[in-house]
Amino acid sequence: MNRTLMQMKNKTSEFWKNRSKLQKILMVSALAAIIIIGIIISVFASNSKMAPLYKDLSAEEAGQIKEELDAKKVPNELSNGGTVISVPEDQVDSLKVQMAAEGLPKTGSIDYSFFGQNAGFGLTDNEFDMVKVKATQTELSNLINEMDGIKNSKVMINLPKDAVFVGEEQSAASASIVLQIQPGYTLDQSQINGLYHLVSKSVPNLKEDNIVIMDQNSTYYDKSDSDAGSYADSYSSQQGIKSQVEKDIQKHVQSLLGTMMGQDKVVVSVTADIDFTKENRTEDIVEPVDKENMEGIAVSAEKVSETYQGDGAANGGTAGTGEEDVTNYKADGENTESGNYEKNSNKINYEVNRIHKEIAESPYKVRDLGIQVMVEPPDAKNTASLSTERQDDIQKILSTVVRTSLDKDETQNQNLSDADINNKIVVSVQPFDGKVNLDTNTEESSGIPLWAYIVGGVLIAAIIVLIIMLIRKKRAQEDEFEEYEYEVPQEPINLPDINEEENETAESVRRKQLEKMAKDKPEDFAKLLRSWLAED
């Protein structure tokens, strides 16, 4: 065993002496890196990952759970001011089941289950009323906590005593609620209205006017009517439509000009004025069929012709000056002269066009539109490199976009001329000094400089090459040692005669001969040692 250790020690020492200084530094560095990596891996492997078992605990609840975990000898950690308790991740589910079976955490709140568990115990009327109010508060708080954005809540209910006398006025109930809103969350008006309605319907004789809701920052939440919510929703909808119209026109113009000038040489901004007036109207229009002659279609016609000719034609009627006669009108029989009578009448019924329209106007119209365009010339340092003809082309394109985007009724009512359309367009030709060069900022955006990747890659490659060299060197030495181990020296080794003193023993003489040989002929001395080791 000792000889084996000596052989390994000698080989290691000889291997180390034959290495250059650079190789020694690389070997030590690689060994240190391997040791450090192994330590880091072992540290992370030994540390079990902790996961929250319960969150948002009170001091009392955290104390109860920690005491139970310590009794079970379960590793645990408290964080976030003692409100969060963590245990090993692989034990979270089992511990939750165990804690629930033991009734932990005990919140101290009374809910409706109290009446089922304590039905056999006697309670006075006052005690029963107190327990009932407490249970109602707890159940109502649990309902509120289920809403989005609410982390926790506390409810205080005040129920009046029943009236003793018939004529006595019954007092109204009241409720106060304090909400703990999650960070970064804002309750919308519909949620607030829902809270008021929920609390009002959960407590008898509780009007919504007697409810007060606040958050942890003392912000008061008031109930609002549905119209206010609809107005807010309408405003949000209108702003969304306006933004969408501007975005669509901006993309269209950016695509047109970007194709012509280059995407990085054009910046487009669009501002729109949208008319959201809604109009529903009914029109009953009557117009002639023949608009030139202003005549309709003849539906029916009636022609009457009446003729009389003869002597003694009576005028008929009650003429004369009698009681029923008309003054200055001849009575019957006064005139028997001959006469002629003719009467013609034409009656035609015309039908016209009757148009009934129920018109619902578009929910929005583009009332006004403005387009601002910034163009970088081909030569950024020379604004004159963008020709006037190209600028005129851009102006014409934008004029067409504005004219076709505006509502036709608005265009006709305002009598927009080409000059008016051009006033809605601005084209600015100037260099883009604030342009971001993505090529130069790639290294900065990554967060890690490029040279760090290069150095890291070189070090990793050097370590890999060094390990390969060491393995190959070790194999070569083992092969060489095996050759020496089985190789029998062919030439005898002559030891110099150094017997200077006759009285010396053979052992001392041999030792001196070996020392002299080691100094004068180290290679032969090494071969001799190998042969002795092989014999052993």
From Swiss-Prot:
Where is the protein found, in the record's own terms?
Answer: Cell membrane; Bacterial flagellum basal body
Major localization listed first in the record, in broad terms: membrane
Q: Which UniProt keywords apply?
A: Bacterial flagellum, Cell membrane, Membrane, Transmembrane, Transmembrane helix
Q: Which InterPro entries match?
A: AMP-bd_C_sf (IPR045851), Flag_M-ring_C (IPR013556), FlgMring_FliF (IPR000067), FliF_N_dom (IPR006182), YscJ/FliF (IPR043427)
Highest taxon, organism lineage: Bacteria
- In Gene Ontology terms, what is a biological process of this protein? bacterial-type flagellum assembly
The keyword Iron belongs to this UniProt entry's keyword annotation:
no
Subunit composition and interactions: The basal body constitutes a major portion of the flagellar organelle and consists of two rings, one in the peptidoglycan layer and one in the plasma membrane.
Q: What does the protein in this record do? A: The M ring may be actively involved in energy transduction.
What family does this belong to?
Belongs to the FliF family.
Tell me the protein's name.
Answer: Flagellar M-ring protein
Q: Which organism is it from?
A: Bacillus subtilis (strain 168)
**Taxon lineage:** Bacteria, Bacillati, Bacillota, Bacilli, Bacillales
> What is the primary gene name for this protein?
fliF
